[in-house]
């Protein structure tokens, strides 16, 4: 059994300005996406130039932040938004939804693709492998914040979160970091190393993330004000993830059939 380390969520205090670890994790994710994007842009099959990657990351970052924050409140905490609309601006408090961020990024990529006249699926295939490092960093931020804790567990690496009592729990944030961040990055980077049918990389991202997320939900506590939706185990995260898996598999099948046609 492990004890959760009491980590100060503020990484650096500069007078009245507090720099939070959670915010720094987003910076790490965006910088990683920018660096990897610049590297991928040197490939002969890249739909964007290295200079265009700068704008792509800016559009993507804007879509992630706006979509993730709005998505959290719309999917998980609509009453909280009505009671405190300014909570939308307090990014350091967490409360970011992946599914909302995905919608925001999709909209941002759509605008970018229209602006530069790039087929949307070519652009999303380029961008998908840039995302997992940011996802993993975000889950590390959740761990530092002491949020999104796991269900009670008796495994040797179970962790006690003092604010929740003495009951050991799964460190589900670290599970998500390992699967949605590290494993997904390795999978997508390997898969996209060779030219693939248009839409295949995007489809793999959607399907693989969906499977990883649905799996980890079995070890993660649902939001207290929502609870389980059915069967004593089904969570809202799993419900929102199912369309991703179906869309991802469908997109891969479509891409390969189109390639072989």
From Swiss-Prot:
It is an enzyme of class 2 (transferase). GO terms for biological process: lipoprotein biosynthetic process. Keywords: Cell inner membrane, Cell membrane, Membrane, Transferase, Transmembrane, Transmembrane helix. PROSITE patterns: LGT (PS01311). Its EC number is 2.5.1.145. It holds the Pfam family LGT. Catalyzes the transfer of the diacylglyceryl group from phosphatidylglycerol to the sulfhydryl group of the N-terminal cysteine of a prolipoprotein, the first step in the formation of mature lipoproteins. This is Phosphatidylglycerol--prolipoprotein diacylglyceryl transferase. It comes from Halorhodospira halophila (strain DSM 244 / SL1). The lineage of its organism: Bacteria, Pseudomonadati, Pseudomonadota, Gammaproteobacteria, Chromatiales.
């Amino acid at each position: 059994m492990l004890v959760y380390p009491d980590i100060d969520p503020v990484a650096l205090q500069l007078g009245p300005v507090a720099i939070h670890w959670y915010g720094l994790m987003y910076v790490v994710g965006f910088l990683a996406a920018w660096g990897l994007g610049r590297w991928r842009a040197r490939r002969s099959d890249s739909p964007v130039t290295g200079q265009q990657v700068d704008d792509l990351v800016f559009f993507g970052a804007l879509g992630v932040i706006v979509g993730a924050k709005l998505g959290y409140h719309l999917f998980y905490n609509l009453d909280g938004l009505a009671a405190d609309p300014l909570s939308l601006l307090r990014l350091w408090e967490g409360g970011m939804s992946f599914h909302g961020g995905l919608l925001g990024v999709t909209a941002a990529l759509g605008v970018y693709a229209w602006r530069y006249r790039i087929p949307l699926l070519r652009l999303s295939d380029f961008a998908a492998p840039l995302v997992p490092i940011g996802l993993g960093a975000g889950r590390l931020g959740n761990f530092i914040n002491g949020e999104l804790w796991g269900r009670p567990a008796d495994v040797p690496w179970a962790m006690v979160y003092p604010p929740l009592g003495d009951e050991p729990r799964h460190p589900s944030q670290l599970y998500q970091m390992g699967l949605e961040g590290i494993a997904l990055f390795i999978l997508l980077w390997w898969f996209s190393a060779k030219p693939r049918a248009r839409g295949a990389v995007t489809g793999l991202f959607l399907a693989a993330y969906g499977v990883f997320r649905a799996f980890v939900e079995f070890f993660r506590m649902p939001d207290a004000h929502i609870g389980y939706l059915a069967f004593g185990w089904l969570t809202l995260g799993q419900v929102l993830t199912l369309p991703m898996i179906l869309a991802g598999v469908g997109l891969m099948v479509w891409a390969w059939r189109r390639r072989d046609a």
